[in-house]
From Swiss-Prot:
Subunit structure and binding partners: Part of the 50S ribosomal subunit.
Protein name: Large ribosomal subunit protein uL13
Record-level GO cellular component terms: cytosolic large ribosomal subunit; ribosome
Organism (species): Neisseria meningitidis serogroup B (strain ATCC BAA-335 / MC58)
Keywords of the record: Ribonucleoprotein, Ribosomal protein
High-level lineage: Bacteria, Pseudomonadati, Pseudomonadota, Betaproteobacteria, Neisseriales
Length: 143
C-alpha cells in the first residue's frame, strides 16, 4: 500500500466559527493554528495546505493569565535608528482588538509561502457579528 499524499485541488475545506469570549489567548491560538494547518484531518500532508477556514468572533474579549494583561509587550520597528515601538496587551486590545490573536497564530504557523496562504484563511472579528454567514460555518467549541 502506498503512502497517501493529499493533492491541493482535492482538499475539502470547511468553515468553522470559534467564540473567543473569556478564552485564554494561547489556547485559542494553538487550536486555530492546528486547524489552519489541517492537522486534525487524516489526510494531513505537511507540504499541502489541507486546513479549514476559521472565523473567530469576540476577539476583544480574549483573556490572558497572570499579569500578562499589563506586562506582555508587542514590539515593532520602523526601520530607522531608534524607531522601536512597544504596546502592552491591554493597549493592543483597545486599539486593535484581535491583532494579538492574529500575531499569536501567525507565530505558530510555518514561515514561507505555505504559512502565508494558511494565515489568509483566518478571519478575526472583535464583536459577535461576522460577514461569513453565507458559508454556513459550523460552531467549534473549545475546551
Amino acid at each position: 500500500m502506498k503512502t497517501f499524499s493529499a493533492k491541493p485541488h482535492e482538499v475539502k475545506r470547511e468553515w468553522f466559527v470559534i467564540d473567543a469570549q473569556d478564552k485564554v489567548l494561547g489556547r485559542v491560538a494553538a487550536e486555530v493554528a492546528s486547524r489552519l494547518r489541517g492537522k486534525h484531518k487524516p489526510e494531513y500532508t505537511p507540504h499541502v495546505d489541507t486546513g479549514d477556514y476559521i472565523i473567530v468572533i469576540n476577539a476583544d474579549k480574549l483573556r490572558v493569565t497572570g499579569a500578562k494583561f499589563e506586562d506582555k509587550k508587542y514590539f515593532r520597528h520602523s526601520g530607522f535608528p531608534g524607531g522601536i515601538y512597544e504596546r502592552t496587551f491591554r493597549e493592543m486590545q483597545e486599539q486593535f482588538p484581535g491583532r494579538a490573536l492574529e500575531q499569536a497564530v501567525k507565530g505558530m504557523l510555518p514561515k514561507g509561502p505555505l504559512g502565508y496562504a494558511m494565515i489568509k484563511k483566518l478571519k478575526v472579528y472583535a464583536g459577535a457579528e461576522h460577514a461569513h454567514a453565507a458559508q454556513q460555518p459550523k460552531v467549534l467549541e473549545l475546551k
